[in-house]
Amino acid sequence: MASIKPLGDRVLVEPRQEAEEKIGSIFVPDTAKEKPQEGKVVEIGSGKYEDGKLIPLEVKVGDTVLYGKYSGTEIKSEGKEYLIIRESDILAVVKK
């Protein structure tokens, strides 16, 4: 698990890892692949303030979420890739 704690209404997401893609005998480089838009919430911020009251986040650690293609900031920690995104950039929680 990452040693990163998001602030405010931000969420730390571990994007779903895509299997290596191969077309015929040619490997598709990471730069040509579509970015995943699904991931697992690994850490959440404390929430956001509205009218002086702290509003907790709706998503929880462990939720699988869908988010916009260009949402968030990509970071690396402990050899893994993560996204820090605002809760408002999360489009849905995937129910299993």
Curated annotation (Swiss-Prot):
GO molecular function terms listed in the Swiss-Prot or TrEMBL record: ATP binding; metal ion binding; protein folding chaperone; protein-folding chaperone binding; unfolded protein binding
SUPFAM superfamilies (UniProt xref): GroES-like
GO biological process, one term: chaperone cofactor-dependent protein refolding
Pfam families membership: Cpn10 (PF00166)
Keywords: Chaperone, Cytoplasm, Stress response
Keyword Transmembrane: no
Main location: cytoplasm
Function text: Together with the chaperonin GroEL, plays an essential role in assisting protein folding. The GroEL-GroES system forms a nano-cage that allows encapsulation of the non-native substrate proteins and provides a physical environment optimized to promote and accelerate protein folding. GroES binds to the apical surface of the GroEL ring, thereby capping the opening of the GroEL channel.
UniProt-listed HAMAP family: CH10 (MF_00580)
NCBIfam families: PRK00364.2-2, PRK00364.2-4, PRK00364.2-5
Protein name per UniProt: Co-chaperonin GroES
Gene from which this protein is expressed: groES
